[in-house]
Amino acid sequence: YTPAVNLVFALDESLKMMREEGLENIFLRHEKHKLAMSNAVKALNLKLFADERYLSPAVTAIQTGEIDAEEFRKTIKNKFDILLAGGQDHLKGKIFRVGHLGYVNNRDIITVVSAISKTLLDQGKITTKQAGEALEVACTYLEAN
């Protein structure tokens, strides 16, 4: 069979990018994104699914309370073209997940926080002040670390 040469080239480029950034810097970036995302979520009065001691540097799972997470995800996809992962099995409709593993930069985190904030604002779930505070919190963590 013929191997997927494009995937081999993509892997090679990904490994070059990782070598350039350095593993320690990659780990620090993922930790920074975890902190920015989780603290922005708290500023929006949403609840993290995991206990803070066990938050993942790869993904942030967010409980939506009375908001239907599937409808929330759909709104963000339609309005901002951002794909958020949903909950599975008994968590479907109750949580959504924001991935921040791999090639994710600060602008991506700011964009997702902004989209979540704007959607909550449009639904009357938060105030403009809270939306601004969430963005400020995310930016503070991204700049400080």
Question: Can you describe what each PLM-predicted range is?
Answer:
Residues 78-84, 117-120:
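A common structural junction motif
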Residues 45-49, 82-87:
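A short linear hydrophobic-aromatic micro-motif
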Residues 47-79:
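Conserved PLP-binding catalytic core of the aspartate aminotransferase-like
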Residues 11-15, 41, 112, 116:
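Buried hydrophobic packing segments
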Residues 1-35:
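Structural signature of PLP-dependent enzymes
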Residues 52-54, 89-92:
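A short beta-turn/loop motif at secondary-structure boundaries
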Residues 18, 59-61, 97-102:
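Short glycine-rich or small-residue beta-strand-to-loop segments that form or flank ligand, phosphate
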Residues 90, 94-145:
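PLP-dependent enzyme catalytic core of the Aspartate aminotransferase-like
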